[in-house]
Amino acid sequence: MTDKTSLSYKDAGVDIDAGNALVGRIKGVVKKTRRPEVMGGLGGFGALCALPQKYREPVLVSGTDGVGTKLRLAMDLKRHDTIGIDLVAMCVNDLVVQGAEPLFFLDYYATGKLDVNTASAVISGIAEGCLQSGCSLVGGETAEMPGMYHGEDYDVAGFCVGVVEKSEIIDGSKVSDGDVLIALGSSGPHSNGYSLVRKILEVSGCDPQTTELDGKPLADHLLAPTRIYVKSVLELIEKVDVHAIAHLTGGGFWENIPRVLPDNTQAVIDESSWQWPEVFNWLQTAGNVERHEMYRTFNCGVGMIIALPAPEVDKALALLNANGENAWKIGIIKASDSEQRVVIE
């Protein structure tokens, strides 16, 4: 019998001690997100959450998302502190457009080699996003998978569950001719279109860390965290008759607005009602991107579009702007049997 070296999990590239160190590092920030409905703490096999008692006929709303190749840009620039906010935003904003209050959030973090500092920065960002949206970070999975990812590269996914009163679900069915469209300003490209962003950076030869735009590095514009609209929109829904809300993500104006429009209606967008933030002008110029493609790929400064009756517009704008949103009238709904569901003019 020959002597053999005793192998460990760490020899195979999985460091359990690093995983435990990460849990110890993030416990404090995770605890700050706790809602009263959450039962138990971190470490259980599953997270328990009661439904808020104020709901008579509660309907659960779920969603999952990632941040796409914005993650690659963040890794290249070694800036990991806001990517977690992006992750939460992409999920909770999708829930609130249906009238749902986010309850709890879980994350999945996968990497080839776990770097505790990087993972801690990402998860701290997730906790910050949960605080901004009023939901609890109740658990997650950190997977160290050597051979699956290159070095310390990582990927993230988020999962969120919210609740809405059955009679108050917002599904677009109330949208009608004459409704007014209100826009909520975005913080930048949010988390969509980054494969094109990175291609533009490559073709233009631009260094986003040294190129300045509006007095700050282009990198700051490109990595600005996705705006979380939850608290402003939930208050709006309580006080105003909201007919539909579209979250402008992948597919931009052309694909997201029609998702909330009933048959025989058309959204008419007034392009003169706002100016694109400089980052979108830069992207269009540097990449020689056609206008139609810009509106299909990016939000162009508009994170959400809300449809409501004309008499509610002034009240809605006052509420939204008082809550720190940049809100304005961007268009109207018209009766139409055209196959073109969105017109930008």
Swiss-Prot record:
Pfam family, one: AIRS
GO CC annotation: cytosol
Subcellular location field: Cytoplasm
InterPro entries per the UniProt record, alphabetical: PurM-like_C_dom, PurM-like_C_sf, PurM-like_N, PurM-like_N_sf, PurM_cligase
UniProt catalytic activity: 2-formamido-N(1)-(5-O-phospho-beta-D-ribosyl)acetamidine + ATP = 5-amino-1-(5-phospho-beta-D-ribosyl)imidazole + ADP + phosphate + H(+)
Extent of the signal sequence: none
Pathway: Purine metabolism; IMP biosynthesis via de novo pathway; 5-amino-1-(5-phospho-D-ribosyl)imidazole from N(2)-formyl-N(1)-(5-phospho-D-ribosyl)glycinamide: step 2/2
GO aspect biological process, one term: adenine biosynthetic process
Protein name: Phosphoribosylformylglycinamidine cyclo-ligase
Gene: purM
